[in-house]
Design a protein with these regions (language model features):
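Secretory/periplasmic and organellar redox-cofactor proteins
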Residues: 1-46, 137-166
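Flexible, glycine-rich phosphate/dinucleotide-binding loops
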Residues: 57, 82, 138
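Thiol/selenol-based redox catalytic cores and closely related redox-interacting motifs
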Residues: 87, 93-166
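N-terminal start-of-chain detector that recognizes signal peptides
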Residues: 23, 45-46, 70-73, 79-80, ...
Length: 166
């Protein structure tokens, strides 16, 4: 059954062509832009699974930081991070207090959201990113003191290169 709005319908029961065009333009043009503006950035909506010690406070701060940056998180508490490192190809020298996995990449330590987004956007052929050593001023390690630090991209063989300097 066809429904028409009597207030806007012409004699033949249809909307006048001008109004139909305006309606379509507003619906597809402005409405589409509005919907696109509300949709989350696909990178920001990525699911990050974090493996961390149940007692680690800085890890919890890093998780909160990621959520504020638009990432969805799932936290898995573990007392055996060494096994998590081994299963995910994290070189011993780069090991930190938590390991995360996002879209097939591994994140080790306090990796900034901007570098995660860049990783997911550029999709380099690496295992993942690491911020070894828990540097002061990195996400989750905020405080009065701030150290400069490197975000390293690492390979399966343990080789790493500077991905970003902060």
């Amino acid at each position: 059954m066809k429904h028409t709005n009597r207030k806007t319908a012409g004699r033949n029961g249809k909307r006048p062509a001008g109004r139909r065009v305006l309606y379509l333009a507003l619906t597809l043009g402005l409405g589409g832009a509005g919907v696109a503006a509300l949709a989350p950035d696909p990178v920001e909506a990525s699911q990050v699974t974090i493996y961390k010690s149940p007692t680690c406070g800085c890890c919890t701060k890093w998780v909160s930081y990621l959520e504020r940056q638009g990432f969805e998180t799932e936290v898995v508490s573990t007392t055996d991070l060494a096994s998590v490192h081994a299963e995910n190809g994290v070189p011993h020298a780069l090991g930190s207090c938590h390991t995360a996995v996002v879209e097939g990449y591994v994140l080790e330590g306090h990796v900034p959201a901007a570098e995660i987004k860049r990783l997911l956007s550029e999709r380099p052929a690496v295992v993942g990113l690491a911020v070894p050593g828990m540097p002061a001023g990195s996400p989750g390690m905020e405080g009065l003191v701030r150290q400069s630090y490197d975000v390293l991209a690492f390979q399966k063989d343990g080789a790493s290169v500077v991905f970003a300097h902060r």
